[in-house]
Amino acid sequence: MNEFKPKVALIMRNDEMIEKFNLKRVTIDTSFGPVDRCFEGYVYNVPVLVIYGRFNGQKVPSNEINFQQTIEAIKNRGVTKVIGTFVVGGINPKMPQGSVYVLGDLIGMSGYNIKWDRNISFHNAEMYEPFCPQLTKKLCDAASKMDFPVKTDATYVTFYGWPRIETKGELKFYNKMGWDVVG
């Protein structure tokens, strides 16, 4: 049995970090099958679990990713704090390409995942405050020390993203609404 107890899960792919901190590859069993693109170890003395967002080498559209499997894998390791890094499209014209955003809110325009298995452990997610205030504060504090553009309290708008990406008109609308990033 694995005695390592991660405090934070990072949903990301950063092979350089995995190598730098000598994170150990692990397989996490779930009711959906094993998740084998997971890594555990210490990053600056914090015990972390790194799990690829598109694990197991999947090359599928976002709507075919089994998010339930990711959630279950994280839960099975006892982690309650999750940080995700994602590639998104910038809407805010004041922020240059390559900017970093710390999200403060989100707008859901992508509908519902009809493949979600409603026969298991159903509960609604509380989304009034969608991001952890303590983690957000830590990210903002760290961001204030960076020498590149960081927008804190950014608004993220979800978009299905498959089989198409946003139209010019949709992006203009999102910008007029004051939203910062889309994905």
Where are these regions (language model features)?
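Metabolite-binding pocket within alpha/beta catalytic cores that recognizes anionic/polar moieties
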Residues: 1-127
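Residue-level recognition of alpha-helix initiation/capping sites
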Residues: 32, 65, 134, 164-166, ...
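Residue-level detector of short coil/turn "hinge" positions at structural boundaries
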Residues: 66, 81, 150-152, 181
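Generic secondary-structure signature for well-ordered alpha-helical cores
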Residues: 79, 105-108, 140-148, 179
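Catalytic beta/alpha-barrel core
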Residues: 129, 180-183
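Active-site rim beta-loop-alpha module in soluble metabolic enzymes
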Residues: 129-176
